[in-house]
Regions:
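Metal-dependent phosphohydrolase cores
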Residues: 7-193
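Short, small-residue-biased leader/transition segments that mark boundaries at the very start
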Residues: 1-5
Length: 193
C-alpha cells in the first residue's frame, strides 16, 4: 500500500508543479498581451504521453524528462512536448538547405521567443523556489550556449538579449520591453504561423 501511496503523492506533486508553472507563464503572457499563448501554454503536459511519464519520474527539483532520458536513453515525453509547443526552439528544427548541416533552426516568431523566455523564468522559479534569482535563467542558458549550434542565429541572439535584460534590469523592465518594443518589431516572413 505504501508504494501506491507514494505514486499517488508523486502524481499530485507533479500536477501541482505543472499547474504552478502554467500559471506563472500565463500571468507573464497576459502582462505582455499574449493572451492566447498564456491560456494554451504547455497544455500537452496534461496528455497521458507526458503526464504519466512526469508522474513516474517526478523529483520536484528538475524536469522529469531528464530522469526519463537517464533511465531509458530518450525522453518520450520531451519528444511529444517539443513537437506540440512552439515556444521551444527545438520545435523549429528542420532539414538544412545550406549543404553544411543536415539540420538547422528556422527563425522563431517573436511571440514564441517571448513565451520561451517566460517559460525559462517560470521553470527556474518552480525548480529553485526561494533560491531563484533573476540571473538564473541567463546562467542556465549560458551553460549550454556553445552547444546550441542548431538554433537559428537570430533566435539565439534574441533569446540571449532578453535574458540579459532580465539579468541586468529585472523582470518588470523585461516584460515592459517585450510588450512595448520587442513584440512590435516582428521581422517580415513569408511563413504563416
Amino acid at each position: 500500500a505504501s508504494d501506491v501511496y507514494k505514486r499517488q503523492m508523486k502524481a499530485l506533486e507533479h500536477l501541482r508543479t505543472i499547474n504552478h508553472h502554467k500559471m506563472l507563464v500565463m500571468k507573464q503572457c497576459f502582462q505582455v498581451g499574449l493572451y492566447k499563448q498564456g491560456l494554451l501554454h504547455d497544455l500537452s503536459k496534461y496528455t497521458p504521453t507526458e503526464f504519466l511519464v512526469g508522474c513516474k519520474y517526478y523529483q520536484g527539483t528538475r524536469s522529469p524528462n531528464n530522469a526519463e532520458r537517464e533511465d531509458i536513453g530518450v525522453s518520450t515525453s520531451w519528444l511529444h512536448h517539443k513537437g506540440r509547443n512552439k515556444h521551444h526552439f527545438e520545435h523549429w528544427v528542420d532539414y538544412s538547405l545550406d549543404g553544411e548541416h543536415v539540420i538547422m533552426g528556422a527563425p522563431m516568431p517573436r511571440k514564441y521567443v517571448a513565451e520561451m523566455v517566460m517559460d525559462r523564468i517560470s521553470a527556474s522559479r518552480n525548480y529553485l523556489g526561494d533560491a531563484y534569482t533573476e540571473s538564473q535563467p541567463l546562467e542556465y542558458y549560458l551553460k549550454s550556449k556553445d552547444s546550441l549550434w542548431f538554433i537559428h542565429p537570430r533566435t539565439k541572439k534574441e533569446l540571449e538579449g532578453l535574458l540579459r535584460i532580465l539579468n541586468d534590469h529585472g523582470e518588470k523592465k523585461l516584460l515592459h520591453y517585450i510588450k512595448y518594443v520587442y513584440l512590435k518589431q516582428e521581422p517580415k516572413s513569408r511563413i504563416k504561423y
